[in-house]
């Protein structure tokens, strides 16, 4: 595994809700996040992720005071949460992929030349690697659409149609 990704809280939360979090760690990607992101999670979500942290599949990075000071001197779009700023900074330091469900963070990463993908991309990878059956992916995407209206409905509908085809 040599590809790295820094992940935000939205990705973890949605995958935990959908019961698919273990599949994120089944991708051929080394998953990282920041302490600031980890601290946004509920106690139950942290407990679930601690299993992956304990076995080395999740890296939670703790910034030094100097790094935190530098992060807060950087120019970010208005309204970008401090935890999301740490995702950008850490990914830039690692020169790696960002996996995020936050539109402001995604746009900032793209503007600054970082590769960035979201939850739909994660689904694509999970299905391509056959970590779940397409029928299960369809069920999970339908559930996702029932509570998360921030996702691109057109992209989800394409996958629902493609993965439902016999």
Which positions does each model-derived feature cover?
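Active-site-proximal, substrate-binding regions of enzyme catalytic domains
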Residues: 2-96, 103, 114, 141, ...
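Acidic, PIN/NYN-like endoribonuclease modules and their adjacent C-terminal/linker elements
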Residues: 45, 106-166
